[in-house]
Swiss-Prot record:
GO terms for molecular function: indole-3-glycerol-phosphate synthase activity; phosphoribosylanthranilate isomerase activity. Coiled coil: none annotated. This is Tryptophan biosynthesis protein TrpCF. Its EC number is 4.1.1.48, 5.3.1.24. Pathway: Amino-acid biosynthesis; L-tryptophan biosynthesis; L-tryptophan from chorismate: step 3/5; Amino-acid biosynthesis; L-tryptophan biosynthesis; L-tryptophan from chorismate: step 4/5. Bifunctional enzyme that catalyzes two sequential steps of tryptophan biosynthetic pathway. The first reaction is catalyzed by the isomerase, coded by the TrpF domain; the second reaction is catalyzed by the synthase, coded by the TrpC domain. Residues 280-475 are annotated as: N-(5'-phosphoribosyl)anthranilate isomerase. Monomer. The gene is trpC. It comes from Yersinia pestis.
Length: 475
């Protein structure tokens, strides 16, 4: 048995007969071994006696922050991980927290240095940027780490049952609670879950990643969550990267801890919106104020229609005015346009994508791809009749499935979407506040709303836009 700061740490489930291969022993065992070395060195570098009189109780209630009817999100500041290496080169904790504060109930900060390139110095940077509780996420084996975390303004800690035995857990949790800090208790299998229940954990994180071999299995949340008693807050951790996963797993969990899927995206704001709400587009924008309304409601994309027969047609000058309203990712909608016209428009407006709404074939798409800016995607709208059209075009990143040629306000038979792979599909046609919730459950990447959120063609209704996005967040 080892003693670290007076707390037993004999109970790591590593190197024991519970672990069935040398490889799986190694990952967690090595991390814990290195953490013991780190703790010993840090105690010499920054003794508790030097700062213990400056430690104050947390004023941000982690447990309360995770209560309520809505699904909650703990969003994570993570520079690197053992499975992926460096995830975010341009890692600025305060900047990241400045985005997260609009969406998160709590914010997690990786502080492990060796495996996650974290730092305790990140904690006060994040704490100063937000009002939410800040979770110190580390391999905690010693009371000293908890005291250090609180000194650096953490409001909660992670305790991993794969690392701690019951006695060590109880003592470490007591230290955290004595500082008014919350505890996220992590379990990754049925045995650890039963221990969490016995130990009276208030918030249980079900880790979908097996730390012994770093594999991901989202079924772990589906299988383990129903075993937890009423009153326990359930957080699903690891492997969550899509809105459809959030909607489906929200039946089992009260919330999600998400890090890698967000940290790997250059546009963090858009990345959070994709996971929390889907990749949604408000199309047919003609006014800057409507672009702003769409953005603040949670849209990722704004649609600009360059088809002159449309009542929502905009020219380049008008489009610039719309774009000035909000930093959406803008999609230009074209039908049977000259390739050079599409290219020029995409370049002049820095479009994120061009959406082809006519009978543009593979040859047209190939030629267009050659001349478009590399960061401008090609989307193709397809009309859905009695059967699902094929989606086999090369160089097409997204398909928009619509009724007819679009803009009709009519929906097609959504039952045709059953058993379809819809990761690269935006659903359009007749979408509004009354049916967007049902539409969101179909599993598409996002929704494309237009006439259903208007008071007149091209004039968006702020209340209807708000109602759509509020409905998308009810899960």
């Amino acid at each position: 048995m080892q003693e670290t700061g007076g707390y037993k740490t004999e109970g790591y489930n590593v190197g024991s007969d519970k672990v069935d291969s040398d490889k799986t022993k190694t990952v967690l065992h090595q991390i814990v071994h290195d953490k013991e070395i780190w703790v010993a060195a840090r105690k010499l570098q920054q003794p508790l006696t030097r700062f213990q009189n400056e430690i104050t109780q947390s004023q941000r209630d982690f447990y309360h922050a995770l209560q309520g009817d809505k699904t909650v999100f703990i969003l994570e500041c993570k520079k690197a991980s053992p499975s992926k290496g460096v995830i975010r080169d341009n890692f600025n904790p305060a900047e990241i927290a400045g985005v997260y504060k609009h969406y998160a109930s709590a914010i997690s900060v990786l502080t492990d240095e060796k495996y996650f390139q974290g730092s305790f110095d990140f904690l006060p940077q994040v704490s100063a940027a937000v009002t939410q509780p800040v979770l110190c996420k580390d391999f905690i084996i010693d009371a000293y780490q908890i005291q250090l975390a609180r000194f650096y303004h953490a409001d909660a800690i992670l305790l991993m049952l794969s690392v701690l035995d019951d006695e060590a857990y109880r003592q470490l949790a007591a230290v955290a609670h004595s500082l008014n800090m919350g505890v996220l208790t992590e379990a990754s299998n049925a045995e650890e879950l039963e221990r969490a229940i016995t130990l009276g954990a208030k918030v249980v994180g079900i880790n979908n990643r097996d730390l012994r071999d770093l594999s991901i299995d989202l079924n772990r949340t589906r299988e383990l969550a129903p075993r937890l008693p009423e009153g326990v807050t359930i957080i699903s951790e690891s492997g969550i990267s899509h809105y459809r996963q959030v909607r489906e797993l929200s039946q089992f969990a009260n919330g999600f801890l998400i890090g890698s899927a967000l940290m790997s995206e250059p546009d963090l704001n858009a990345a959070v919106r994709r996971v929390l709400l889907g990749e949604n587009k408000v199309c047919g924008l003609t006014r800057a104020q409507d672009a702003a309304t769409a953005y603040h409601a949670g849209a990722v994309y704004g649609g600009l229609i360059f088809v002159d027969s449309s009542p929502r047609y905009v020219d380049i000058a008008s489009a610039r005015t719309v774009i000035s309203g909000a930093p959406l990712k803008y999609v230009g909608v074209f039908r049977h346009a000259e390739i050079e016209t599409v290219r020029q428009t995409a370049e002049q407006l820095s479009l994120a994508a061009v959406q082809l709404h006519g009978h543009e074939d593979q040859q047209y798409i190939n030629q267009l791809r050659k001349v478009l800016p590399a960061d401008c995607q090609i989307w193709k709208a397809l009309s859905v009749g009695d059967t699902m059209p094929e989606r086999n075009l090369q160089q097409v990143e997204r398909y928009v499935l619509d009724h007819g040629t679009g803009g009709t306000g009519q929906r097609f038979d959504w039952s045709l979407l059953a058993d379809q792979a819809l990761d690269n599909v935006l659903l359009a046609g007749g979408l509004g506040p009354d049916n967007c919730d049902v539409a969101a459950q179909l599993g598409c990447a996002g929704l494309d709303v237009n006439s259903g959120v208007e008071s007149a063609p091209g004039i968006k209704d702020p209340q209807r836009i708000a109602a759509v996005f509020q409905a998308l967040r009810v899960y």
